[in-house]
Amino acid sequence: LGAATGEASVLSAEQRQRWITEAARLNTQVYRERVLADPRYGREHHERGPRKLGSRLALFDCLSCDKCIPVCPNDANFTLVVPQLELPMSTVTPSPGGFVVERRGVLRVDERHQIAHFADACNDCGNCEVFCPEDGGPQLEKPRFFGSLEALRADPHGRGFFVERAGQAVVVVARMGGRELRLHTEGARARFEGERFSLRFDWRDPEGTIEGEAQGPVDLGEAHILHTLGAAVLAPREVNPVSSSDANARQEASP
């Protein structure tokens, strides 16, 4: 700009902008030629997707590699701490004398480090599914949390969870298998409701304290899943989209 010749040169704002635009155009041509010549950017280098292991994702536990978290453009995937535990899977059926309990085994949670998904932030790009070493897609198979009950009910995938506080209680609403379930927990007391049942029990002995009404068998294992996820996502040290929304709501409600 005249410095090389020792001449003073002052550009007007318009001249400076034209100079920047032209420099960017010329630089882009250089970048283009370099990219086309670099095999790292060629089709042959990217025809194969990331390696898959052949295993399938489930609601709990996975490789815990966390690859799905940084590859999401919207930060929709996050981690949760869930205690290692065995969730009892049982079915309760109404009978003239109360309820008959059929135990089906347990659902093991082996890893404290769990992956979860905030569906409100997801644009269904599938990028996390591409990079996940397991099949199924974290955005679909992992616990899908929603920021409102309306968003949960409107979701086309038909599965997920909405968690909120109601006074001292924690309420978890879930859509599972095309059904809407609601679990209300306050202290040790729980109320588990669905389209054809309304049960009450104590978490210290769920199977032994069941009372209420049901028009058929009820999967009590689903209540354990809702309870575990609700407690985990709102745990005091957890910082995630659900706990943040809960903290904001409590702050707005405080005098």
Name every feature range the model reports, one short phrase each:
Residues 1-121:
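Ferredoxin-type iron-sulfur electron-transfer modules and their immediate structural context
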Residues 1-55, 125, 166-255:
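Iron-sulfur (Fe-S) cluster-binding modules
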Residues 41, 60, 78, 99, ...:
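Phenylalanine-focused residue identity feature
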Residues 65-71, 75, 125-138:
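Cys/His-rich metal-chelating microdomains
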Residues 81-93, 104-116, 129, 133-167:
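Catalytic or ion-translocation cores adjacent to nucleophile or general acid/base/metal-coordination motifs
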